[in-house]
From Swiss-Prot:
Protein name from the UniProt record: 1-acylglycerol-3-phosphate O-acyltransferase PNPLA3
TM spans (from-to): 42-62
Single GO MF annotation: diolein transacylation activity
Residue spans, topological domain Lumenal: 63-481
Cellular localisation: Membrane; Lipid droplet
Recorded consequence of changing residue 311 to G: 67% loss of 1-acylglycerol-3-phosphate O-acyltransferase catalytic activity
Source organism phylogeny: Eukaryota, Metazoa, Chordata, Craniata, Vertebrata
Motif GXSXG per UniProt: ranges: 45-49
Motif extent (GXGXXG): 14-19
Bilayer topology term: Single-pass type II membrane protein
Motif DGA/G positions after renumbering to this chain: 166-168
Any one annotated GO CC term: lipid droplet
GO biological process, one term: triglyceride catabolic process
Active-site annotation: 47, 166
Length: 481
């Protein structure tokens, strides 16, 4: 919600490969209401939303942002089985792209102005990170915020020695004050800037603060957030973000400068914004000719967008940003050259699928070897962490099974022998990676052994070096025992 008197913040939802939507929405705000971005108290984001916030605060140009996102999509779609190919490593690509694109002083530019949503592995609680001491910490926080368990890998990355996963697991639309935060999401739901659905269905579901309207459109968007569609579809989503943001500005009445729409001539425009093909366009040009000038890769993009928007939003198509349309047009082009065109021929594609049972094992072996080589420096810590998590799981399972087995015992046996010998109870005391608890006494009862073990693993005080290692929330121990 926008509140000019109390100030405002912006929150960008986690949306995977649909981050193009945030680019379009932010471009509209920067053109029609630049004060919303310039004077915002903080920018919040989870996963792809956090990446976008860092890009905005770092001043990364629009063209470079679209290029990075497009390269990620091309990388994910370059194989026959897409993201499921063993060679696709999302975290590795993100880390390399961030180290390349972010400026050296990015930690100074964003500290105190951003809130990156992280999910702590130890207790599943949400953590908002705002202050950074170096560029490496910014990269680590972003990689943690984008790490989807089992999708990005098995071992979560760490930030300042603590393991974190995707912030969307605990809070996908982070904010501090809901009344003064403008929320942005590419999903149909209850947000300030989001698509509007052509339906009378008002059923919603909330998942980690992600409000989703129950409709087929959201099912499609959720699937495309993990499995990227064609770049033309993502270009349409980017333009959709621009239109939804403009509708929000119109509803709030906070547009404060003329629209740089497609009907405008190139006179008085920035040289990098003006397109050569629009130089001969006059102010009297019809909406059809204006739309024709910015159709990307033919007529598919805008025509498909016109079919998917609401009737009263068609007039907003004339306000689309020329610079955004130009940048999208460049990224939609096939950059593979003749070799890419040859590989996209139908006979070649059929042959590649036929040969997949032969080529996939070889490619998988190569990808596994490469991952093992890059994993060698972190292997000792990660193996110890896996052992620690395994012991946690074993302890929880044991604790859940013990009450059931005790309840099945005869009443007479329970009254006759309140303390059963240790060897009659399958209890195992796991050890942490960097230290073991004190040796238990042989004459201790099973309940005391179990309580001691659980207090060690589930207590408020975690051993040094084991922060962020538990994968389950803690609970009251006395009630269970």
């Amino acid at each position: 919600m926008y509140d000019a008197e109390r100030g405002w913040s912006l929150s960008f939802a986690g949306c995977g490969f649909l981050g193009f939507y945030h680019v379009g929405a932010t471009r509209c705000l920067s053109e029609h209401a630049p004060h919303l971005l310039r004077d915002a108290r903080m920018l919040f984001g989870a996963s792809a939303g956090a990446l976008h916030c860092v890009g905005v605060l770092s001043g990364i140009p629009l063209e470079q942002t679209l290029q990075v996102l497009s390269d990620l999509v091309r990388k994910a779609r370059s194989r026959n089985i897409g993201i499921f190919h063993p060679s696709f490593n999302l975290s590795k690509f993100l880390r390399q792209g961030l180290c390349k694109c972010l400026p050296a002083n990015v930690h100074q530019l964003i500290s105190g102005k951003i809130g990156i949503s992280l999910t702590r592995v130890s207790d599943g609680e949400n953590v908002l990170v705002s202050d950074f001491r170096s560029k490496d910490e910014v990269v680590d926080a972003l990689v943690c915020s984008c790490f989807i368990p089992f999708y990005s890998g098995l071992i979560p990355p760490s930030f300042r020695g603590v393991r974190y996963v995707d912030g969307g697991v605990s809070d996908n639309v982070p904010f501090i004050d809901a009344k003064t935060t403008i929320t942005v999401s590419p999903f149909y739901g209850e947000y300030d800037i989001c698509p509007k659905v052509k339906s009378t269905n008002f059923l919603h579901v909330d998942i980690t603060k992600l409000s989703l309207r129950l409709c087929t459109g959201n099912l499609y968007l959720l699937s495309r957030a993990f499995v990227p569609p064609d770049l033309k579809v993502l270009g349409e989503i980017c333009l959709r973000g621009y239109l939804d943001a403009f509708r929000f500005l119109e509803e709030k009445g906070i547009c404060n400068r003329p629209q740089p729409g497609l009907k405008s001539s190139s006179e008085g425009m920035d040289p990098e914004v003006a397109m050569p093909s629009w130089a001969n366009m006059s102010l009297d040009s019809s909406p059809e000719s204006a739309a024709l000038a910015v159709r990307l890769e033919g007529d598919e993009l805008l025509d498909h967008l016109r079919l998917s928007i609401l009737p009263w939003d068609e007039s907003i198509l004339d306000t689309l940003s020329p610079r955004l349309a130009t940048a999208l047009s460049e990224e939609m082009k096939d950059k593979g050259g003749y070799m890419s065109k040859i590989c996209n021929l139908l006979p070649i594609r059929i042959m590649s699928y036929v040969m997949l049972p032969c080529t996939l094992p070889v490619e998988s072996a190569i990808a596994i070897v490469q991952r093992l080589v890059t994993w060698l420096p972190d292997m000792p810590d990660d193996v110890l962490w896996l052992q620690w998590v395994t012991s946690q799981v074993f302890t929880r399972v044991l604790m859940c099974l013990l009450p059931a087995s005790r309840s099945q015992m005869p009443v007479s046996s329970q009254q006759a022998s309140p303390c059963t010998p240790e060897q009659d109870w399958p209890c195992w005391t796991p050890c942490s990676p960097k230290g073991c608890p004190a040796e238990t006494k042989a004459e201790a009862t099973p309940r005391s052994i179990l309580r001691s073990s659980l207090n060690f693993f589930l207590g408020n005080k975690v051993p040094a070096g084991a922060e962020g290692l538990s994968t389950f929330p803690s609970f009251s121990l006395e009630k269970s025992l």
